[in-house]
Amino acid sequence: MMATAGAVAATVMTPEQARAQALARVDYPANRLANIADLEVNEPMDIAYPDADSPGVLLKFGQAVEGGVGPDGDIVAFSVLCPHKGWLMSYSPTDKTLNCPGHHSRFDCEVGGQQIWGHATSNLAQFLLRVDDQGDIHAEGVDELIYGRLSNVL
């Protein structure tokens, strides 16, 4: 028979050391994108957020959608850079999707930019919006990684 010996090690921490530490956060600018009056149902408006190197689209659907803001909960905004390879996508008003010409990924704009087809491995980056009392639409954050960036999520 073989005998084995083992040792157990323990680390003792003070309560201060054991407290959860906040992770680093990305601070986003609160950019005004448009006014509700500027939007037409199912007509995309080109925007950029959080900076000029991040193209996006602002959409009004006329009925409440996932992540929608405004009086009807029908206004959303997304990055138009495909999360697969960064191709610039176009909006299809027929099926309310953003479509990539590169490898044919498709994303449902009524369901939070959820991927419905193609090679992408994540949903679209959705811009977090707020509507003020004057109807101005402000972007204040991003909920997914924008293609080509290493850290832009909250």
Name each region found by the language model.
Residues 1-21:
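N-terminal export signals
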Residues 14-95, 125-154:
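N-terminal pre-ligand scaffold of iron-sulfur
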Residues 53-55, 106, 115:
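Short, solvent-exposed loop/turn motifs
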Residues 65-68, 111-115:
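A short, acidic/glycine-rich surface segment
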Residues 73, 103-104:
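Short loop/turn microsegments at loop-to-beta-strand junctions
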Residues 89-94, 106-113:
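Iron-sulfur (Fe-S) cluster-binding segments and ferredoxin-like electron-carrier domains
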Residues 96-103, 114-124:
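Short cysteine/histidine-rich metal-coordination sites, predominantly Zn2+-binding motifs
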